Amino acid sequence: MVAATGTGKTVISALDYKRFRKQNPDRPCRLLFVAHREEILKQSLYTFRAVLKDANFGELFVGNYKPESIDNLFLSIQTFNSQSFTEKTSPDFYDYIIVDEFHHAAAPTYQKLLSYYQPRILLGLTATPERMDGKSILPYFHNRIAAEIRLPEAIDRKLLCPFQYFGVTDTVDLLSLIHI
């Protein structure tokens, strides 16, 4: 899913996961939500709990947070890479995997996770699918984007507040830094 910051990617992903659980009542529907920052993971966990109306849903595995169960996990990519996490789970353990800031997925730090797991659903969330190194993330999704709303459209549709940029000029001569 490609959507501008603030348009509700996490809420939409939680609603889709809720739909998935309802359609699969006889499965455990284990969720793995992966992000690169603790703040994103905490906010996402709270969003899922609100959408699912379950104050006990999911656990964090990041920083000082250690889960009692890994069934529905909000995991940092750093923790995944440092904990030999694949030894604790089979490739099909998670039914639904969400990777926030999916534009990072082409980086080596995400390759182990994406090549190991075989979820029934893989959902990538990003506002910026284009990468500076030219690597595409679309092959993970059969070269398709499931849903897309870019910043100009989100503003035009009044999903976001309009904004203004302000530039500040200064007199600092940065040319002297070239020789450092």
Q: What are these model-predicted stretches?
A:
Residues 104-163:
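Post-DEXD/H (motif II) to motif III coupling segment of the RecA-like Helicase ATP-binding lobe
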Residues 39-60:
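Conserved helix-turn-beta segment of the N-terminal RecA-like "Helicase ATP-binding" lobe
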Residues 100-101:
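Walker B catalytic acidic pair
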Residues 30, 70-72, 94-96, 119-123:
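Loop/turn-to-beta-strand initiation segments
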Residues 178-180:
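Conserved small/polar residues in nucleotide/adenosyl-binding loops
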Residues 29-37:
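Conserved RecA-like ASCE P-loop NTPase motor core of nucleic-acid helicases/translocases
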Residues 1-16:
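Walker A/P-loop
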Residues 63-93, 107, 111-112:
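Conserved helix/coil segment N-terminal to the catalytic DExD/H
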